[in-house]
Structure formats: structure tokens, C-alpha cells
């Protein structure tokens, strides 16, 4: 696959909400923060990486060996609708639906899909909220 630079996908809010098609990743995730130098050693394992002035944030799978040691586990819900990076309003509608139920959400937009990170223990509530979201 070559490198693509234009933003493919849907931009119409009604079409986006009608086709969200959320999918739960069965593996818990964790957010890590490390110095830029230390983060380089974990990048191959990272689902997502973002550099900030203070260091690098990584989202990684939680290993079964250290599952019990986590303070906060996160579930990833992928919105399988192919949304454009230029789409307006979809994440606002999704965030509002989750906020109405008191579910924290950390969204990440990738090139083809959007991903929601919600507390692991609220993952089923989040899926239910998304299933009731209407255009």
C-alpha cells in the first residue's frame, strides 16, 4: 500500500451516524507516558503514539502477565464507518451520547476510522449508547 494524502471517506453527518458500526477490541489497553528517548523502545508495540513537549504518550495492549497491575484499563471501540478527516460533527455526536451516560471518552482519529478509548469497565455501556445514536 502506498502513502495516501487525501482524505477519503464520508463527510455527511447523517450517513456517518447511520453507518457507525462500532467494534469492540477484546484486548484491554493502557496509556503510557515516557520520555521521548524511552518511548522509542516501545514504539514497535504501540497502537498509537503522540509526541508532546513533555514526552511521548503511547497506547499499548495490556499483557496478561501484568493485567492485575493496571490502575486504569481502557477499551478500544473502532467506528468501522470510513469517515473523512474533514467530517464535521460525528465525534461531537458520539461524545455527547457517551457524556449523557457519564462515560469518559478519549477519541483518536486515524486516516480511515475513528477509535474511542473508554474505561474498560464501561465498554458495554458505551456500545449500548452508540447503538442508540440516531442520525
For the regions a language model picked out, list residue spans one by one:
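Conserved short beta-strand edge segments in small beta-sheet-based binding/regulatory domains
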Residues: 75-82, 106-108, 134-135
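Phosphate/ribose-phosphate-bearing ligand recognition and processing surfaces
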Residues: 116
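Regulatory modules associated with amino-acid/nitrogen control
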Residues: 1-97
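Structural preference for solvent-exposed beta-strand-turn elements
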Residues: 109-113, 122
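A short linear hydrophobic-aromatic micro-motif
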Residues: 45-47, 102-107
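Helix N-cap motif at beta-to-alpha junctions
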Residues: 62-65, 119-125
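Generic non-transmembrane alpha-helical segments
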Residues: 94-97, 101-103, 129-133
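Charge-rich, low-aromatic oligomerization/scaffolding segments with amphipathic character
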Residues: 50-53, 123-135
Amino acid at each position: 500500500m502506498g502513502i495516501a494524502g487525501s482524505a477519503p471517506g464520508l463527510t455527511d453527518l447523517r450517513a456517518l451516524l447511520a453507518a457507525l458500526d462500532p467494534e469492540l477490541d477484546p484486548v484491554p489497553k493502557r496509556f503510557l507516558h515516557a520520555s521521548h528517548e524511552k518511548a522509542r523502545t516501545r514504539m514497535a508495540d504501540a497502537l498509537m503514539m503522540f509526541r508532546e513537549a513533555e514526552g511521548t504518550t503511547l497506547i499499548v495492549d495490556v499483557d496478561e502477565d501484568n493485567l492485575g497491575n493496571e490502575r486504569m484499563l481502557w477499551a478500544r471501540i473502532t467506528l468501522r464507518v470510513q469517515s473523512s478527516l474533514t467530517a464535521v460533527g460525528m465525534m461531537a455526536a458520539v461524545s455527547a451520547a457517551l457524556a449523557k451516560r457519564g462515560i469518559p471518552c478519549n477519541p483518536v482519529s486515524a486516516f480511515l476510522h475513528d477509535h474511542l478509548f473508554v474505561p474498560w469497565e464501561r465498554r458495554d455501556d458505551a456500545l449500548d449508547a452508540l447503538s442508540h445514536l440516531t442520525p
